[in-house]
Amino acid sequence: MASTRRALVIGTGTGGLASAAFLAKDGFDVLALDAGAEIGGYLAPFSQDGFVFDQGLHYVGACRPGQLVHELFQSLGVDAGELFRELDPDGFDLYRFPDLDVQVCRPLAAYRERLTALFPEETKGLRHFFGLLDGAARMHDALARGILGRPVLTDLVALTGVPALLQWSQRPLRELIEQSTSDERLRAVLAGQSGAWALPPSRVVGLAALLYMAHFSDGAFFPRGGGGGLRDALVHAAEAKGAQFRTRALVERIETERGRVTGVVLAGGERIEADIVVSAVDPTITLGRLVSASDLPTSLRRKAAVIEPSMATFQIWLGMRRDLRTYGLGAQNVWLYPSYDVEEGFSARFTGKLPPRPMLFLSPTSIKDPSGALAPEGSSSLVVLTYVPHARFRKWQSLPEAERGPAYAAYRDEIAQWMLKELDARYPGLVGDVVVQAYGTPLTAADQTRATAGAPFGPAMTLSQWGPKGFRTRTPVTGLYLAGSGVFGGGVAPCLLSGLAASFMAKLAPK
């Protein structure tokens, strides 16, 4: 492997940072480019008045020794045991419905027992659902060991459940839930993590949802220092192997010659030559704008043009001079559903209208990382999130933030008050002693990360877009590879894997 081979990485979110680190580890001369002023994409935090806020990271699974995320970081020379802190093992997720609270615990067997105690008449259906979920967990672990080159004989056991699981690669999660129980409340509980993949149960691929849930089958973790801590660990790992980074470097075009990548051209005309280019931005941008149409099959161009993005978010970042643990929050995520109709919380995505009451997600980041890095002593940082239709903000998207005017500010404030009213109804008195109150709309996400339609999870994991119908690491252009949430899905682990896959493919590329 010649160390003189130049690799360029476009975008420095989790997938781009992982690509840079693995490519540098494999001996490439790496330069990672980001169009923004700061490295990290959704991992890049912002700070105000001593409070530090995450834009997109809430928890990570498979962080124990021998598990996927732990081993990926270890392979890069990062002490994963030091980086990650476990969330509450008895309830890393709390689902709060109108008259029912359910804490998601580890391991899967304990969570199944908890639900069986709550719903004793649904034992058979829970056995069916958790049988598939347990099979997905075994498949997840077997795939992880295979990817890491450490398969074991017992992985063959996971293969016995493949036929039963594979049918759910063609069927939505809602069908599995309805097949398992007719109890309205239990159906809502089994769909409680839907916000994590930003789709209602009727739209998300069943197997994709099962694998996501399985990723947290042995608990959930949060990085010390939040998203910024995770970003810094990846940056340091890449730089330790010689990788370099440039900000304010907007790639305008990926150049090719005879079907092979030759470099990129930046806004302003600067050309940077390369043997390998890994694009870790949305595939619709890479394949729809950066690569010449003549270099791609018509079918792939059409696919990139019609991809449905994941749902956009509206976030409220709160910094408060109070300890939220005294108000009932802990080292966990909280999902607040206004009813047992989980579908309703996502209806805005498809109707363009907001529901009467929002589904809310709470992330008390300063409790998840009690080191003091995210909030001053005696204070707390809190992220409050809901999903909104990007279409409601489209008329302002072409304008710079400073020029969006009072109508945009008024609509932004209206949604924030709608969310805070619901939060106060569910957690009376939680918000107070406020020092920082900032908002992030779908346009904020697009401004800061250039996410298509402000979507934080890349292409939606629907039946027509996930798995074999999704995008691949390899492209028809020799030397051009994809990484990021558009390859294996959103979240830390899929994006880390996308970087590993891009590096692996780059090593195999003809010189």
Q: Across the structure, where does each feature detected by a protein language model lie?
A:
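Short beta-strand to alpha-helix junction loop
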Residues: 64, 164-173, 216-236, 246, ...
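Mid-domain catalytic core of redox enzymes
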Residues: 252-376
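A conserved FAD-binding loop/helix module that cradles the flavin
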Residues: 57, 485-507
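A glycine-rich dinucleotide-binding beta-alpha-beta segment and adjacent secondary-structure elements
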Residues: 183-197, 357-361, 420, 425-489
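C-terminal segments that line or cap access tunnels to active or ligand-binding sites in enzymes
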Residues: 321-440
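Rossmann-like flavin
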Residues: 98-204
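N-terminal glycine-rich phosphate/pyrophosphate-binding loop and immediately adjacent elements
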Residues: 3-138, 459-461
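Helical element adjacent to the flavin cofactor pocket in flavoenzyme catalytic cores
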Residues: 210-261, 265-267
